[in-house]
Every structure is written in structure tokens, then in C-alpha cells.
């Protein structure tokens, strides 16, 4: 059976169907994210709507600073490659992201339409798995969390509150 996904509707079998804003691939690199994304840009075309570096981050709550050797590494970059898909990525940096292994460097990134949807997906999909970054408000303004599910798949969920994103 093929279901048409219509926001907050039910099909003839009374199965609730949900909509999601966007599902994208998130690629993690060991220091060469900028080089890789410039290559992808040369093939796909387009522009980077955002490039953030680890040096742009504020100090952590315990006062730790980003080491000088990591400050120019990419914290987040995005490259729209179609109307539906954005390729996103970052470098690993510091002890909190030292587990880069080819094979575990791809995550499924979900951008939700509401904070409640982010909570529901995070809580449901992380059950039995390992939370690597608890779902919380971030310094860049998003409600964001990361985990590895019980099947070993890496996930991210992000909600951008439109009221916070307008400057």
C-alpha cells in the first residue's frame, strides 16, 4: 500500500500520517570538510547559505575553549543540492568529537516543523540507543540533539523556531 503524506491527516485505515520539513544527509570529516564541500559545490553548483567554524563557538559552560588547532575547522556547513535536499557537514574537533571513523561519519538529519515534533522523534528514535548530545536549546538558536539508535544509525534532530531565527 502506498500512503500519501498529508500533514495531520489520517488515511482510510485511520493511520496518522506525519509531515516532516526535511530529511538530509549529514557528513562528518576529519579536518577536510571545507575541501570536500568546495568539491561538492564545484559539482552541484550553488552557494553555501551558512559556514560556521569552531572558533565561532562561545566557551563551554565549564569554561573550556576550542583549541587553536581546531578553531578554523568547520563546525557546520550546508549546501542546497536540490529544492528538497541540503547536503550538510562538519569536521570533528576536540575530545568531544574524537570518534570519527569512516563508516560512522554519516548521520540522518531531520529538520522538524515544531519543538514537540523534535521531542517526539528524539525520544522515540533514541530509545534503546545512545544519546550523544541531549536535545536542548543551542547557542546558534536551534533546538538540537544527536544520538545513535539501537541499530547503530546516527541521527540528528533540529528545530529552528522562526521567531528566534529572525534578526
Task: Cite the ranges covered by each PLM segment.
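Glyoxalase I/VOC metalloenzyme domain signal
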Residues: 2-133, 146-167
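Short, small/polar residue-rich loop motifs at catalytic or cofactor-binding pockets
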Residues: 73, 139-142
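Acidic interhelical loop/turn segments
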Residues: 134-138
Amino acid at each position: 500500500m502506498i500512503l500519501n503524506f498529508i500533514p495531520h491527516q489520517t488515511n482510510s485505515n485511520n493511520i496518522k500520517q506525519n509531515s516532516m520539513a526535511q530529511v538530509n544527509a549529514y557528513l562528518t570529516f576529519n579536518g577536510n570538510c571545507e575541501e570536500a564541500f568546495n568539491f561538492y559545490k564545484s559539482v552541484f553548483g550553488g552557494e553555501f547559505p551558512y559556514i560556521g567554524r569552531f572558533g565561532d563557538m562561545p566557551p563551554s559552560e565549564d569554561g573550556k575553549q576550542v583549541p587553536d588547532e581546531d578553531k578554523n575547522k568547520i563546525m557546520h556547513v550546508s549546501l542546497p543540492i536540490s529544492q528538497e535536499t541540503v547536503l550538510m557537514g562538519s569536521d570533528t574537533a576536540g575530545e568531544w568529537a574524537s570518534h570519527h571513523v569512516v563508516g560512522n561519519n554519516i548521520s540522518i538529519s531531520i529538520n522538524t516543523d515544531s519543538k514537540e515534533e523534535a521531542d517526539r522523534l528524539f525520544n522515540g528514535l533514541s530509545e534503546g540507543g545512545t544519546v550523544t548530545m541531549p536535545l536542548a536549546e543551542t547557542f546558534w538558536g536551534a533546538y538540537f540533539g544527536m544520538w545513535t539508535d539501537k541499530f547503530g544509525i546516527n541521527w540528528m534532530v533540529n528545530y529552528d523556531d522562526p521567531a528566534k531565527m529572525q534578526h
